[in-house]
């Protein structure tokens, strides 16, 4: 029994290293060299084919503009404060209940402060009234960083935070900031003046403004929303067109989206109210599958 075990151990040792034939694991040094060389060449060729394929593909892709941009959906409309459950609920006499909303607005508006827009090599004044879209050259063929339009916080009026650091929440008159999500090269097309009668808009018309309106979403909400005040450039209820098109993060890393502030001044207390805000334009679409495409709704409840 012991002899058989010793013989078995000897055969294993001989397989690992055969001193007579100079073999390691059944192969000579030359054999190991050939097989290793084969696999190095084999996997090297595979890696070369893979890298070459990637390089060819990258030559067809622009780092500045998507190849198939016609498949991009219309931009979404979103609100600040950004909340997970799209629900704003607070007590005006309890600062802790609305602290998170206020801090969210403050953080978002940091880049809109005058001190953040001082560099004249990056920012430029584009006027105090809405004007036509501002073209800044071809996206694909012209390199170099493009300038962006400044946006003044005081255009947001009561919701700017300049005079009320609670953005109306302390008084039970909450503000929300509305923005149109960035889409590369997108140029909003406002509705034509003669077609405005099809929209429930109570505002002055301007062909260079993409209008936005907030209303009660359900019939029972409409009488409970109360008065709504809008604050935007030039007193218009929407987004001025000179901030478009957007040229992307590489060409406009400091781009500022135009904003619209909305303040609800007399919401019914102790009632959950659903508010829908909607942008109107010829190339603004809506989808039942995406509730933020061109519109959004938020629940607001002011507790006594």
Swiss-Prot record:
Residue numbers spanned by region immunoglobulin-like: 191-304
Superkingdom, taxonomy of origin: Eukaryota
Residues the record lists as Phosphoserine modifications: 11
Biological processes annotated in GO: ATP metabolic process; cardiac muscle contraction; cell adhesion; establishment or maintenance of transmembrane electrochemical gradient; intracellular calcium ion homeostasis; intracellular potassium ion homeostasis; intracellular sodium ion homeostasis; membrane repolarization
Carbohydrate-modified residues: 158, 193, 266
Residue ranges, Extracellular side: 63-304
Chloroplast found in the keyword field: no
Disulphides: 126-149, 159-175, 214-277
Entry keywords, A to Z: Cell adhesion, Cell membrane, Disulfide bond, Glutathionylation, Glycoprotein, Ion transport, Membrane, Phosphoprotein, Potassium, Potassium transport, Signal-anchor, Sodium, Sodium transport, Sodium/potassium transport, Transmembrane, Transmembrane helix, Transport
Transmembrane segments: 35-62
Membrane topology: Single-pass type II membrane protein
Subcellular location: Cell membrane; Apical cell membrane; Cell membrane, Sarcolemma
InterPro entries (alphabetical): Na/K_ATPase_sub_beta, Na/K_ATPase_sub_beta_sf
Post-translational modification as stated in the protein's UniProt record: Glutathionylated. N-glycosylated.
Family membership noted in the UniProt record: Belongs to the X(+)/potassium ATPases subunit beta family.
Domain free text: The C-terminal lobe folds into an immunoglobulin-like domain and mediates cell adhesion properties.
Function, as annotated: This is the non-catalytic component of the active enzyme, which catalyzes the hydrolysis of ATP coupled with the exchange of Na(+) and K(+) ions across the plasma membrane. The beta subunit regulates, through assembly of alpha/beta heterodimers, the number of sodium pumps transported to the plasma membrane. Involved in cell adhesion and establishing epithelial cell polarity.
Name of this chain's protein: Sodium/potassium-transporting ATPase subunit beta-1
Species per Swiss-Prot/TrEMBL record: Mus musculus (Mouse)
